[in-house]
Regions:
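Basic, flexible Lys/Arg- and Gly-enriched helix-loop patches that mediate nucleic-acid binding at interfaces
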Residues: 2-263
């Protein structure tokens, strides 16, 4: 399959094979390189070839891979839990809190000390759209910080700050919430304040680093929205399957069509 015939919006072939249960991602790369994979009748040996598992016929050793139905699961990741599928150090992973054995993966990450909405799916095109900075999908957070930011500090966050190791300004659409505002009954202690923050790109520890640059330490950080998907009334450690309307709205916001999901 030549590069000009690839769909740039598709998924990498080795990832599709791994999600279909053929083998591990590394082993799938070896299978591709050995010439054992055909896409629409053509042998593919180039790693990174992009395919559409919904429309392309993919075969390994002459056998078509089984198409896995798309799955979408929302989890309230608690603090102290890492946003990975496996951890070599034996720490609790977000994946271990998901009540299914299906192969679904987290979309992006939340810091270990952060909490809130984490989406799991096997919908590769959706995950790619939600994570890639150029698509500018909104993610909303509530942050409890030490101190009360000035209007000048809030304006600086909205305009963007150049942080160490960054080459361009990072922005955060930040609003100071009323002193009486609370997150599920938890009001800001004296000398602290809750903020509402919206990001349209994601860099490591972006919110914590930006607020630290304005002189404020983050005590608590909660993600409550990813695009059109809301955390809702989930409690820490709880999860749920997305409704068809939630799934379709999320895909539509990412510029994708609807898909028939298993749940």
């Amino acid at each position: 399959m030549s590069a000009e015939h690839q769909d740039p919006r598709g998924e990498r072939l080795q990832k599709v094979l791994a999600h279909a249960g053929v083998a591990s991602r590394r082993r799938c790369e070896e299978i591709i390189a050995a010439g054992r994979v055909r896409v629409n009748g053509r042998v593919v040996t180039t790693l990174g070839t992009r395919v559409d598992p919904e429309h392309d016929r993919i075969e390994v050793d002459g056998r078509p891979i089984e198409s896995t139905p798309p799955l979408y699961y929302a989890l309230y990741k608690p603090t102290g839990v890492i946003s990975t599928v496996h951890d070599p150090h034996g720490r609790t992973t977000a994946r271990s809190l998901v009540s299914t054995e299906e192969r679904i993966y987290p979309v992006g990450r939340l810091d270990r000390d952060s909490e809130g909405l984490l989406l799991f799916t096997n919908d590769g095109p959706l995950a790619q759209r939600l994570m890639h900075p150029r698509h500018e999908h909104e993610k909303q957070y509530y942050a409890l910080i030490e101190g009360i930011p000035t209007n000048q500090a809030l304006q600086a966050l909205r305009r963007g700050l150049v942080l160490p190791s960054e080459t361009r300004p990072l922005k955060a659409e930040t609003q100071r919430l009323p002193a009486a505002w609370h997150w599920r009954g938890h009001r800001a202690p004296q000398g602290c304040r809750w903020l509402s923050i919206i990001l349209r790109e994601g860099h490591k520890h972006q919110i914590r680093r930006l607020l630290q640059a304005t002189g404020h330490q983050v005590q608590r950080l909660i993600r409550v929205r990813m695009g059109t998907l809301m955390l809702g009334d989930l409690e820490p450690g709880q999860g749920r399957w997305l409704s068809p309307s939630e799934r379709d709205a999320l895909r539509a916001s990412a510029g994708l069509g609807t898909r028939e999901a298993e749940r």
